[in-house]
């Protein structure tokens, strides 16, 4: 088996619906896994890429299993470092939005107090 379902899987079941061989199974606990007896990695089919990988909305839910330990280690390391160093502006956007709303409310209440 060249592909596996990772912990990044969001259980959307899209991979199981696009798998041409029905190799993606769902365990009793809801966790997805790939049956290596059924998986053909979409080789010798009309598809040019494995459909589980192509259909995954998370991009990391279905990944290729590296043949070499260190290849897998560095692939995981590079993926994690890229995620950690990516600029995340969530809190900046949150602050800008709510500080503006707070400022508007404060001015409104100050106007009411001074007008009374």
Swiss-Prot record:
GO biological process: nitrogen fixation
Pfam families in UniProt: Fer4
Keywords in alphabetical order: 4Fe-4S, Electron transport, Iron, Iron-sulfur, Metal-binding, Nitrogen fixation, Transport
GO molecular function, one term: metal ion binding
Origin: domain of life: Bacteria
Domain 4Fe-4S ferredoxin-type: 2-29
UniProt: iron-sulfur cluster binding residues: 9, 12, 15, 19
Protein name: Ferredoxin-like protein in nif region
Organism in which the protein naturally occurs: Nostoc sp. (strain PCC 7120 / SAG 25.82 / UTEX 2576)
Gene: fdxN
């Amino acid at each position: 088996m060249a592909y596996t379902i990772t912990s990044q899987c969001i259980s959307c079941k899209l991979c199981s619906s696009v798998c041409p061989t029905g190799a993606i199974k769902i365990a009793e606990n809801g966790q997805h896994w790939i049956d290596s007896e059924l998986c053909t990695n979409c080789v010798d089919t009309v598809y040019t890429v494995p459909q589980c990988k192509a259909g995954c909305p998370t991009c990391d839910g279905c990944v290729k299993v590296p043949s070499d330990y260190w290849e897998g280690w560095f692939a995981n390391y590079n993926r994690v470092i890229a995620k950690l160093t990516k600029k995340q502006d969530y809190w900046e956007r949150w602050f800008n939005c709510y500080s503006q709303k707070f400022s508007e409310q404060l001015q409104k209440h100050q106007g009411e107090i001074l007008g009374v």
